[in-house]
């Protein structure tokens, strides 16, 4: 069953402050001001609805959308209707849209982006008044905290919402406020509901591994941390965030989720439960490996202090203590379930593994800058990307479609795309290949290609590989559950991947984002035996780790709660891994457990607001570029190289600290000023500060290794960086022409230079606002920049008028009709220009021009005339205006008109014997009924 997204309000705290924290608004007004967002459903939203007695029948909602679609279809054929009929249809459409809005809108749940601590304190102390109702803080999940966002709820129901979502936990059990925030916030995770499974909770399993590390000891204040290589013995939780699910329960959930396959892994959510379930034949294991015994220990104890036993024949899900965050706040599973039932809390699945993995992995600069690559390696790595972009051409329509719409298409998929409510200009291209002559469509394709090239300069190139779920050996897991000493099916240096085994690949490079240090590339030797094929047979996808190494430490402290791992078999990348690099380790601070108060919660919020992870990642990129520059000039055996290298390790530690910042509820060390701030040294300063000769020497040294310059390729990441670079080059270009009467490029390429020219170039590079060396990413960037993809000649932006007859209706409009369309479209163009950026990946601003479109149609009284007015507005009278608005407003009706002229389309489909080559696969053009 499809579930539409829920509409909620979202404000910036500065807006609330401007109006004295009191705002009165309607849904339509809030939507026009971009203060309405759409969120996937969650337990928190379901609880609020239940308290309010509001039930959303999502099947009924689909009927509403179908009814609205029916009215749209009638309007699309309104050339044959009377003016009165059109007005009735428009009115009915407005009424059903209002019903949809009313059904999906939840005014009790509002998100606020906190822009100052004073705003936060005011909202927590006094609340905000929205439409006459008082709202106070309800929650702040870890993800929301990183974006300085809180959820507020109306005072009318907030106490009951908290009481239900607290789910009867034992409040006398000490708990860190920051942890509680994160656990309580899990109820706002987007989930699809599934039936309650029969489950047990088991203890986690830990063992140790001894290995050598770069150990970081934090030094307070404006100083580098101490980094020393030493051997350590570290305990690892092999079941961290992971549980098991039987194939029969996995099949049941798959059916409930509307899937035609059994996912190898499911994400899991329930009150204070979070993690991943791996599909594994737990009952078969008990029968064959555990000697037919199904009796196992659970985590709970009876009154005599003995572990309560469970018969696994009666259960289908095994949950670890690390998944059940507050297991010790309940007497047992029955107590927990009783509370779940009383509070009407449902089991949910946020995500699940796909039926098939992709065959192409998009790399990124973090993955690439941490490799040992030379110029030839860069060319080889970029070859598939260059060939991919070079293949896009006006003359190769089939390739163009694959570039625009992707691969793995089916007839059903093409039809679903044609019926969907977005990308209408692309639909027009599919319906009629002649639309490739449209200047607007060509400009869209040109922009897309240019964007792909720019992203390529940033490291977004393609290699064989994909992302898969990280899994801890489920065979060893079941051994642990059954009380058998875990040996697993994988040795200390073994890993498993069905995907790669099917392709005969025995070694891959594993990478987990965000990737900061070289050791986070792990060469994985893949194992395949009759035993692995039998017991891992439900893991069609997923990367299985052994229970004996320290791989999770290399992967930045990964766990198994649905973390994903990138793997590639690309030989250049595998060769480029620093195979003997040590991983980073530090003593991470632990949060204080206590009976927390509201004040503790507020402190935890404030500590967790904002994130400087991006800044730390940038500093590591700066350091990699600087390290390459130092190597080129001075080699590795010098203090400059050693300190810069040490800072890369410290960046890794700082990033880990920032990720855990919200969990521990206190500030962590970030980037020392010593790394980025230039310290002036003149005679007066030296005298006034009393600097010794050694002090001056040290200051000069640290000034020489500042991480204050972005690498060259970052000009494609930040517009400001590009502007500074371009301005600097222009100034020096002019100076070069004035001084030497030649271009800068010519001067650089001169074999023999005068002392003055050498000095000019030395200064040019010294004061360059970016680091210009041969680091892997800088080389890659310059290589792609140097290729002439001939976009202008392949995708020319010719005159568009020839395509207008392809999209117009057979209808004549009047001047009065045009003026109606002109007025409304002009308003929509202003609104489109002012669209804000309030959202993140999990939410989207609700922008809907359909009511404006219907208004034009109803006032003109004819869809054909209305569409033709709009087409002429953009193509005849205002050709420079943004045609995105034309397709947003009238795309549905243009496509309906085009579909009447064609019953089939031709589309490139996967075909092993096909004659169309694209990204290493073959396709053939096939007829598709629409």
Predicted regions span which residues?
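Conserved small-residue
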Residues: 1-556, 572-575, 594-930
């Amino acid at each position: 069953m499809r579930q539409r997204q829920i509409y909620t309000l979202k404000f910036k705290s500065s807006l609330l402050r401007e109006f004295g924290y009191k705002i009165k608004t309607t849904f339509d007004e809030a939507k026009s001001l971009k203060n309405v967002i759409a969120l996937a459903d969650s337990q928190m939203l379901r609880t609020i609805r239940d308290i309010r007695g509001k039930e959303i029948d999502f099947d009924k909602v689909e009927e509403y959308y179908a009814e609205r679609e029916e009215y749209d279809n009638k309007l699309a054929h309104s050339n044959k209707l009377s003016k009165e009929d059109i007005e009735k249809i428009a009115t009915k459409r407005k009424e059903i849209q209002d019903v949809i809005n009313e059904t999906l809108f939840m005014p009790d749940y509002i998100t606020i982006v906190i822009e100052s601590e004073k705003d936060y304190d005011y909202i927590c102390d006094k609340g905000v008044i929205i439409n006459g109702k008082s709202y106070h803080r309800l929650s702040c999940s870890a993800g929301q905290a990183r974006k300085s966002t809180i959820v507020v709820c109306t005072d009318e129901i907030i106490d009951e919402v908290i009481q239900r979502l607290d789910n009867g936990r034992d409040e006398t059990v000490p708990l860190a406020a920051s942890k509680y925030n994160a656990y309580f916030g899990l109820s706002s995770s987007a989930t699809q509901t599934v039936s309650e499974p029969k489950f047990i909770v088991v203890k986690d399993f830990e063992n140790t591994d001894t290995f050598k590390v770069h150990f970081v000891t934090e030094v307070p204040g404006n100083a580098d941390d101490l980094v020393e290589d030493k051997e350590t013995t570290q305990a690892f939780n092999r079941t961290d965030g992971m549980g098991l699910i039987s194939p029969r329960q996995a099949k049941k959930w798959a059916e409930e989720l509307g899937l035609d396959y059994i996912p190898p892994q499911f994400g899991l959510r329930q009150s204070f439960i979070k993690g991943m379930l791996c599909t594994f034949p737990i009952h078969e294991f008990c029968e064959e490996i555990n000697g037919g015994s199904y009796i196992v220990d659970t985590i709970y104890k009876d009154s005599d202090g003995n572990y309560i036993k469970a018969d696994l024949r009666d259960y289908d899900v095994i949950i670890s203590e690390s998944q059940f965050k507050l297991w010790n706040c309940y007497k047992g599973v029955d107590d927990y379930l009783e509370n779940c039932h009383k509070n009407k809390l449902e089991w949910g699945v946020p995500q699940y593994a796909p039926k098939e993995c992709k065959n192409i992995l998009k790399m990124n600069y973090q993955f690439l800058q941490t490799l040992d690559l030379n110029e030839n390696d860069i060319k080889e790595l970029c070859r598939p990307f260059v060939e991919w972009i070079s293949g896009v051409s006006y003359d190769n329509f089939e390739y163009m479609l694959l570039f625009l719409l992707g691969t793995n298409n089916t007839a059903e998929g093409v039809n679903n795309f044609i019926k969907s409510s977005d990308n209408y200009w692309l639909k027009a291209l599919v319906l009629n290949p002649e639309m490739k002559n449209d200047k607007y469509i060509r400009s869209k394709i040109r922009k897309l290609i240019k964007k792909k090239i720019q992203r390529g300069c940033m490291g977004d190139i393609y290699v064989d590989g994909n992302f898969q779920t990280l899994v801890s050996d489920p065979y060893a897991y079941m051994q642990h559950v059954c009380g058998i000493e875990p040996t697993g099916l994988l040795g200390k240096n073994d890993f498993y991947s069905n995907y790669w085994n099917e392709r005969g690949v025995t070694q891959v490079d594993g990478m987990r984002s965000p990737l900061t240090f070289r050791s986070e590339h792990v060469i994985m030797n893949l194992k395949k035996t009759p035993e692995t094929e039998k017991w891992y047979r439900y893991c069609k996808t997923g990367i299985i780790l052994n229970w004996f190494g320290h791989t999770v430490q290399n992967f930045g402290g990964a766990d198994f709660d649905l973390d994903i791992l990138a793997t590639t078999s690309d030989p250049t990348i595998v060769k480029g891994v620093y195979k003997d690099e040590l991983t980073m380790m530090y003593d991470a601070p632990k949060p204080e457990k206590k009976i927390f108060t509201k004040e503790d919660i507020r402190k935890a919020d404030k500590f967790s607001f904002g994130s400087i992870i991006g800044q730390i990642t940038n500093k590591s990129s700066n350091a990699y570029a600087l390290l390459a520059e130092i190597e080129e000039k001075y080699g590795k055996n010098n203090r400059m190289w050693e300190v810069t290298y040490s800072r890369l390790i410290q960046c890794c530690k700082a990033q880990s600290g920032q990720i855990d910042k919200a969990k521990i509820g206190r500030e962590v060390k970030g980037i020392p000023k010593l790394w980025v701030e230039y310290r002036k040294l003149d005679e007066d300063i030296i005298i006034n500060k009393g600097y010794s000769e050694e002090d001056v020497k040290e200051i000069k040294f640290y000034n020489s290794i500042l991480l204050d310059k972005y690498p060259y390729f970052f000009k494609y990441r930040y517009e400001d960086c590009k502007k500074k670079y371009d301005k600097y080059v222009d100034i020096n270009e002019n100076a070069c022409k004035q001084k030497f009467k030649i271009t800068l490029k010519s001067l650089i390429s001169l074999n023999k230079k005068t002392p003055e020219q050498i000095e000019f170039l030395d200064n040019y590079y010294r004061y360059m606002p970016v680091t210009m060396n041969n680091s892997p990413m800088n080389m890659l960037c310059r290589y792609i920049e140097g290729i002439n993809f001939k976009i202008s000649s392949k995708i020319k932006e010719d005159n568009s008028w020839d395509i207008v007859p392809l999209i117009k209706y057979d209808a004549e409009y009047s001047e009065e009709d045009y003026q109606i369309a002109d007025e409304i479209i002009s308003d929509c163009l202003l609104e489109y220009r002012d669209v804000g950026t309030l959202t993140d990946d999990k939410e989207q601003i609700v922008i809907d021009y359909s009511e404006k479109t219907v208004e034009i149609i109803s006032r003109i009284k004819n869809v054909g005339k209305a569409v033709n007015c709009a087409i002429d507005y953009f193509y005849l009278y205002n050709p420079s205006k943004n045609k995105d608005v034309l397709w947003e407003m009238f795309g549905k009706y243009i496509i309906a008109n085009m579909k009447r002229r064609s019953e089939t389309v031709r589309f490139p489909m996967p075909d092993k014997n096909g004659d169309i080559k694209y990204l290493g696969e073959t396709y053939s053009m096939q007829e598709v009924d629409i």
